[in-house]
Amino acid sequence: LFFALLTLCDCARTSRCRVEVLCDAAVSPLTAALARLMALLGTAALTLALTLLTWLPWTAHTVGAVFDGGDYLLAYLILMGLALPLCILLAGAAWQFTRRFDLSLVLVAALAALSLTIWRDNWQLCWLNPCVWALSDDFSNFRILRSAAYMRLTWLLGLAGLWALSYLCIRRYGRGPLG
């Protein structure tokens, strides 16, 4: 959720500083939205890589002889790595539809609350925290990680489509989504 808040703060920066008209005159709002998305996704990838490398020695030491680098990498990439783009796409789409920080924050918080409470028991709907209770060192984790990956990729495609739809609704010259 930190990256969702970071996305909303970055999107609201030009209107909060009252330089939105100047930025829109210098760079097309469509180009700015795409560049913002790429920058945030790049930051998320860098954060994931640094987190993965930072926790690697501690995890290998704590788990001991049963440590498997493949399971470690897959677990981080699926469980944490795909959550970052989901938050960025959701917050970016909410911002592009509403163009208001407070409404976008409420939308993201509502979907996060649904994922953590009501949708918790449905593995396909809990986008924020997948239904993975434990990973095994005796049996294969492939089925658990595969179902979590399917769930994450389904949400990733859905939120990418929602972001693309919101990209088409970027307001230019204050005319609104239909202008």
Predicted regions and their residues:
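Secretory targeting signals
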Residues: L1-C9, A33-D102, L135-F139, T154
